[in-house]
Amino acid sequence: MTEETRKSQLSRRQLLGTSAFVAAAGASGLGGALLAGSSETALAAGAAKGGMSPEVKPGELDEYYVFFSSGQCGEVRIVGLPSMRELMRIPVFNRDSATGWGLTNESRKVLTEGLLPQDREFLKDRGDIFLNGDLHHPHPSFTDGTYDGRYLYANDKANTRVCRIRLDVMKCDKIIQLPNQHTVHGLRVQKYPKTGYVFCNGEDRVPIPNDGSHLNDVKQYHAIFTAVDGETMKVAWQVMVDGNLDNVDCDYQGKYAFSTCYNSEEGTTLAEMMSSEQDWIVVFNLKRIEEAVANGDFKEMNGVPVIDGRHGSKYTRYIPVPNSPHGINTAPDGIHVVANGKLSPTVTVFDVRKFDDLFDDKIKPRDAVVAEPELGLGPLHTAYDDKGNAYTTLFIDSQICKWNIEDAKRAFKGEKVDPIRQKLDVHYQPGHNHSSMGQTKEVDGKWLISLNKFSKDRYLNVGPLKPENDQLIDISGDKMVIVHDGPSFAEPHDATIVHRSKINPVSFWSREDPFFADAVAQAKADGLDLMEANEVVRDGNKVRVYMTSSAPAFGLTEFTVQQDDEVTVYVTNIDEIEDLTHGFAIVNYGVNMEVAPQATASVTFKASKPGVWWYYCSWFCHAMHMEMQGRMLVEPKKA
């Protein structure tokens, strides 16, 4: 290890040796209290002293949307800020009973059309779709460094997928599975000139192809970095790298993306993965990679151009940092990038303006580092305000550390200056944190959310499984002040705070919307108009049932099919009243789906049980809601 590196980091052994007791205390929720020192505990009373309040009175609206991931629940949750009220859930990788996501033909098309061939085959006897997902890192699309209100992208760590959500209707319209890659952990989107690319980190290293021919030959294992075209939702290119990729971000100039990396040792056990004093971040030169694709400097693997970006490649640069960095976050000043140490008490600050010289071999990799302040134990993620300050979560300490970037740079040059402004106890063990508009050039410095992994004693006891704790912090003044605790179900890994002026959802579906275009096309082929049709069409043993719905009645009060028919029911909500969603459920047939105003939804099932089966509107849409029903008559097979 060089003298330059030695003086700019605390070794892994020092960290683990000095923090064993604190780590145990942190796991019990006491870490912040034990390390009080310069820390403070600030409560909601601060709001009464002139700070901001989370109160949103009845009839008033929140100023921000917050898009929360849900981890292993597989959905996106929309929360209002500052009230922290949950407004809506968007099913994505999960099966959702309320809306019929995963059951309706429209949702199943989204869930299946982007599957890889081998997984399509794998799922044939498993219902054709994955029933689980692990949704991390929801991030909206950009134009010129700020949100443009078009899309939200997120990743599925469990099944190596990426989704796109339309922000006009708040529904997922595309899901793709990434070839060659094993898991997607970090995901960020191109900020400039627009999105553009969706950058996806492949965390685990596996053989390519992963067909069982190299099970234990770890030299054949590789990690993959993927760029997805956010407009077409197709893989644009991939880069093979050394080590395991963790989190990713990109610059405000459209030139570079960069990922944290752990397991530079390329081991397969915890001890092997932690044996080195250092890992690295990988910087990707987007222009050079695009030129490589254009010039054919790649190997095609599973239909995708894969570029060699391992050590020595002209397409990447590896910058050493302390062991096992986790989050990487670009500051809204467009200059600085912070990699968070996790196993080191430090964060590493890079100046993106130095990356040009780095790729031209005019400077050494560590010359791109401009600060490396020691903040506390377990730094994971960093957010920003509009005053040049950064806010880093300290997992083991159970704290948020507020520090100043320019002072950290001065200290790195040897000046006697402390960049730390404040440490705030949070409850407990924070992971991600996010500031209002803080991932854009329009950061406003008002609010910070700390996504804490444990709630412990903050809420009524609900049994062994307890909620997470999302704490809202006022950062508009000189001191951070906690103003709200919000419980959340498993398990938010990330969130993005977007000002409401950036998003303009509709209240009605357009009849020209592509989401239900297949239903429109089928009705047209049957000579019908979905806005008027209340008919049954038989095609052999396939039966298509068309009906309208207008509260409080379905257009068909009964329909008859034969046992073992394949039945597709199309329901079109012809109401033109805002917030008048209908449902369609068939008793004892496992069928339920949402039908929003002016939308069509469809479901296909086998009528395997003869008898009388009532269907009803599962959404309370009218005073005569209970009477909005009809009969499905299933004639038994003839002997």
Curated annotation (Swiss-Prot):
Binding-site list for Cu cation Z3: 137, 432
Cofactor(s), names only, from the UniProt record: Ca(2+); Cu cation
Reaction(s) catalysed by this chain's protein: N2 + 2 Fe(III)-[cytochrome c] + H2O = nitrous oxide + 2 Fe(II)-[cytochrome c] + 2 H(+)
Binding residues for Cu cation A2: 617, 619, 621, 625
Assigned EC number: 1.7.2.4
Residues reported to bind Ca(2+) 2: 262, 265, 273, 279, 324
Region: COX2-like, residue numbers: 541-639
Annotated Gene3D superfamilies: Cupredoxins - blue copper proteins, YVTN repeat-like/Quinoprotein amine dehydrogenase
Family assignment from sequence similarity: Belongs to the NosZ family. In the C-terminal section; belongs to the cytochrome c oxidase subunit 2 family.
The protein's role, per its UniProt record: Nitrous-oxide reductase is part of a bacterial respiratory system which is activated under anaerobic conditions in the presence of nitrate or nitrous oxide.
Name by which UniProt lists this protein: Nitrous-oxide reductase
